[in-house]
Amino acid sequence: MNRFTAYAALFFMFSLCSTAKEAGFLHPAFNFRGTSTMSASSGDYSAAPTPLYKSWALPSSLNLTTQPPPPLTDRSYYELVQALTSKMRLDCQTVGDMTWRHLSEMLFASWNSVKEVSLKAASVTLWAIINIWFGLYWTLARLITLFLWTFSIEALCLILLGCITSLIYKGALSLSEHLPVFLFMSPLKIIWRAAFSKRNYKNERAVEGYKGFSVPQKPPKSAVIELQHENGSHLGYANCIRLYSGENALVTAEHCLEGAFATSLKTGNRIPMSTFFPIFKSARNDISILVGPPNWEGLLSVKGAHFITADKIGKGPASFYTLEKGEWMCHSATIDGAHHQFVSVLCNTGPGYSGTGFWSSKNLLGVLKGFPLEEECNYNVMSVIPSIPGITSPNYVFESTAVKGRVFSDEAVKELEREASEAVKKLARFKSLTDKNWADDYDSDEDYGLEREAATNAPAEKTAQTNSAEKTAPSTSAEKTALTNKPLNGQAAPSAKTNGNSDIPDAATSAPPMDKMVEQIITAMVGRINLSEIEEKIVSRVSQKALQKPKQKKRGRRGGKNKQNSLPPTSTQSTSGAPKKEAAPQASGSAGTSRATTTPAPEAKPSGGKNSAKFTPSWRIKQQDSAGQKPDLKLNSKA
């Protein structure tokens, strides 16, 4: 039965398709709009879709007549099925739209409800958490307050014990972290130092085959001083130089600083080297430049000497000074060449010579380091002074020709300058953990404290005389010319020229203070000076010199004795031949401009005879006095 029904349905559909094809399936009359006004409930079947007619198929306006719609029975099955399908599709679309609209409204209302409920639930939950948390803290605070109020001493003890326990725990943790590394690395460091840190230099020895000589002679400007141990035994030497910053400094070998005392043979004073502040220190180059405490030059009775930096050292003869049986001896030496960052020197040295300076005339070249341990090296080495702008060299560039016969190349000089600059910057950035450097502890030294107290309590008269001499005498700084570098082996280094004003500024005005302690000491010392007493003494000395009668100088070419007689107002005419030249007071002289070089002027005459007079005397008629005689004109006799 089911199979028969299926076959009947297929036959019915095939018949419909055949009928539609025969009736003109693609005819324009069967192109429906897809809309209908038929209502299923009214039973009006005449409301079939209106076919679309093309413009050529429309009847003319004259033949239009109202015709009733054909009955449905005249339609084909295809048209009926098509109309039914369109109706069903439209009804389904309408029902679907209404269903979707109702579902959307329901979903939107449900979403709003769920959202409101969720927000309320979250708010209630958060406030519950806040209340519980705050309640816990409030309860805990009340309990702690009650506990501290009731058991104050016990609570304090517990807090201290807790802090101590925490510190012990942190210390144990840190120790457990670093102790294995320390135990592992310490033997490696010891092995490394023993294997690769062998010394390449020894401090002193005599050069084989070099025959030197020694003569008794004092160092230039007493610039070489002895370094001693704390017990007074000999240690080495140090040299005083004048820096371009205007300060005086000590230069010595770096290995001579530990436990050393700077000792003066003139004054007998001793100053520990720990009170000196290093402005340059290099263990690799074995040289140190140190600035001392206030008035250390006066305590040691030394003056700053000139020096030559590494970029200007040339080959040639040199000398160095040592102390033998309480007397200074000058020994010969020869600058031979370069040895790595040092200078090779041919000289005979012995134990205790370290730190002594090598001199070319009055210029310091460097300090003695020792001698290299290589087999082929038969000479000593000298540590040179690096060129540090503003400290050991000026900040400007010399406009001169290139230096001839230099020992170091440009690359070696630049390397020395770079190392010196890094060392100075490292010392400037150094700050102790206790905010107090080792150079600030010179007040705690008993020997130096007694020496400084004795120097401070010196007679005020000596200070007044020194100040008055500086006030009355003309400034000699303008009369001094810049010292040039002395020739070495016939080859001279370039010299800095001055224009009358010293290029080296005064230490009190240009040199920056070492630290606040030194500045306070200087301020206290200046505050102790009695300026009123000094001014009175200066005025008294100047007035005494102004009231003194100038002495008449003898003429070397005229002969005879010049007598200065006081004449009455009606004196006779003068027969001296020239008006008297009054001598200016000593304090009225002015400093003249200094020459730009130390070489003799081309117009200067050789020594051996006196220069002629700087003026030519001329005769003038003396005015007639009220009761005097008329002058007789006479000509001077030519000498």
Curated annotation (Swiss-Prot):
Keywords per UniProt: Hydrolase, Membrane, Protease, RNA-binding, Serine protease, Signal, Transmembrane, Transmembrane helix
Enzyme nomenclature, EC number: 3.4.21.-
Domain notes: The C-terminus part of protein P1 and VPg/P1-C25 displays RNA-binding properties.
Sites marked Cleavage: 204-205, 399-400
Family of this protein: Belongs to the peptidase S39B family.
Lineage start: Viruses, Riboviria, Orthornavirae, Pisuviricota, Pisoniviricetes
Stated role: Precursor from which the VPg molecule is probably released at the onset of the RNA synthesis. Essential for virus replication. Participates, together with the proteins P0 and P7, in the inhibition of the induction of aphid-induced host phytohormones. This could play a role in the attraction to the infected plants by aphids.
Domain Peptidase S39 stretches: 207-399
Extent of Polar residues compositional bias: 463-488, 566-577
Name of the protein this chain belongs to: Protein P1
Pfam families: Peptidase_S39
Residues the record marks as active site: 255, 286, 354
Low complexity bias (residue ranges): 587-602
Post-translational modification: Specific enzymatic cleavages in vivo yield mature proteins. The protease probably cleaves itself and releases the VPg protein. The VPg protein is probably further cleaved in its C-terminus.
Biased segments, Basic residues type: 548-561
GO molecular function terms listed in the Swiss-Prot or TrEMBL record: RNA binding; serine-type endopeptidase activity; serine-type exopeptidase activity
Membrane-spanning parts: 121-141, 144-164, 172-192
Species the sequence originates in: Potato leafroll virus (strain Potato/Scotland/strain 1/1984) (PLrV)
Region (Disordered): 455-515, 539-639
GO cellular component terms given for this protein: membrane
Cited InterPro entries: Luteovirus_Orf2, Peptidase_S1_PA, Peptidase_S1_PA_chymotrypsin, Peptidase_S39B_luteovirus
